[in-house]
């Protein structure tokens, strides 16, 4: 197996310079305008541009993500959205606000501190911008566990706050695996609209399922496991589409595997799991910088390449990556599934949420909000 030192040596080779002509420029004729908050490397922007939108403002505090964003879109995002000078740069009028607000406070992979974590309170910055600018549509995304955090109270507070701002609020859980990528990545999606309620029914009917094998590189420098690690039981297909092809947790140590298994156990708090290329992949992590996920393909166990990780998130082949290898894994793990965002954006347009409304909808009466997904 190739060592960490060799991987780090390759990091400089993978550091891409900013391009003179960024590959993803805004459309000349846009159907709507949007602002991109907590923009990361631009997953939301790619999806909404594919749906016909034009970005008029972006904000991201992470320097590495800012560089990647600039390399692809030709503009440097504004910084900390909590600062008055950043919010002052937001255009007065725009049609849609999108925000994948920080998920670590609500994620199983994080410490699930919720609003106790300062990142968990950033959603209130979104509320302030909504109140000031009154966009026609607000599109929010977070981890599936937001639904269960603090016994559902966290999500209930968010939904009620959105309703009190005078928006029709609808939410559901969508899985990236239904939108043409081989990844079991479930996310809470919230759509807030002024004109009329949004319906998730058409999106819930999407079942464009694919398998991981169709997204893998056929040639390249792959990092394989040695035979000492490949004591594989019979594969097990899960309802999620995941196919486990390797021992889990302590079991792998009970069958005489090399003590160096510690290297394998760094897999995003899901130790010693190997996934078959005939299924889908679990959600790429947002915190494990080494990105060590292993797959069984053509009888061999190997690590997913960087290109494959970006591909199973729906990023185009010409997407520019910047930073060291670990940074690039972290950036893609923090992003969103591009085809899913594009599908949501197209459905928002199709349902007529973005044309100018004759008037704003009256505020929705606050109350106990059901935690059942809305259509």
Map each language-model feature to its residues:
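Short, histidine-centered active-site or binding-site loop motifs used for metal coordination
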Residues: 110, 142-144, 288, 325
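Short acidic/polar capping segments at secondary-structure boundaries
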Residues: 144-145, 176-179, 195-197
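Short beta-strands and strand-loop turn motifs
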Residues: 137-143, 172, 322
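Short glycine-biased active-site loop of nucleotidyltransferases that positions the nucleotide triphosphate
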Residues: 89-90, 180-183
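Core alpha/beta nucleotide-donor-binding catalytic domains of modification enzymes
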Residues: 2-137, 144-156, 163
């Amino acid at each position: 197996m190739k060592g960490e030192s060799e991987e780090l040596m390759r990091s400089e080779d993978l550091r891409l310079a900013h391009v003179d002509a960024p590959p993803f420029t805004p459309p000349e004729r846009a159907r709507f305008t949007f602002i991109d908050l907590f923009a990361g490397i631009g997953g939301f922007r790619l999806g909404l541009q594919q749906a016909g939108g034009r970005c008029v403002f972006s904000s991201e505090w992470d320097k590495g993500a800012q560089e990647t964003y600039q390399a692809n879109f030709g503009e440097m995002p504004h910084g900390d959205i909590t600062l008055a000078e950043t919010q002052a740069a937001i255009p007065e009028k725009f049609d849609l606000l999108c925000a994948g607000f920080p998920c670590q406070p609500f994620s199983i992979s994080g410490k699930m501190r919720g609003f106790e974590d300062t990142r968990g309170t950033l959603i209130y910055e979104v509320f302030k911008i909504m109140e000031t600018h009154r966009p026609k549509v607000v599109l929010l995304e977070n981890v599936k566990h937001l639904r269960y955090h603090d016994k559902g109270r966290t999500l209930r507070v968010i939904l009620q706050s959105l309703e009190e701002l005078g928006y029709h609020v609808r939410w559901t859980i969508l899985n990236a695996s239904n939108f043409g990528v081989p990844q079991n990545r479930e996310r809470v999606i919230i759509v807030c609209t002024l004109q009329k309620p949004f319906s998730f029914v058409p999106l819930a009917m999407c079942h464009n399922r694919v398998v991981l094998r169709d997204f893998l590189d056929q040639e390249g420098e792959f990092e394989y496991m040695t035979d000492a690690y490949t004591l594989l039981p019979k594969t097990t297909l899960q309802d999620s589409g995941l196919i486990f092809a390797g021992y889990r947790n302590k079991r792998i140590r009970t069958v005489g595997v090399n003590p160096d298994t510690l290297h394998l156990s760094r897999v995003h708090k899901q130790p010693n799991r190997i996934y078959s290329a005939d299924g889908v992949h679990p959600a790429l992590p947002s915190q494990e910088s080494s990105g060590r996920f292993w797959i069984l393909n053509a009888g061999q166990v190997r690590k997913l390449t960087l290109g494959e990780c970006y591909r199973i998130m729906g990023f185009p082949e010409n997407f520019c990556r910047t930073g060291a290898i670990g940074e690039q894994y972290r950036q893609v793990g923090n992003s969103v599934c591009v085809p899913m965002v594009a599908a949501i954006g197209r459905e928002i347009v199709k349902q007529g949420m973005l044309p100018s409304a004759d008037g704003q909808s009256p505020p929705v009466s606050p109350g106990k909000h059901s935690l059942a997904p809305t259509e």
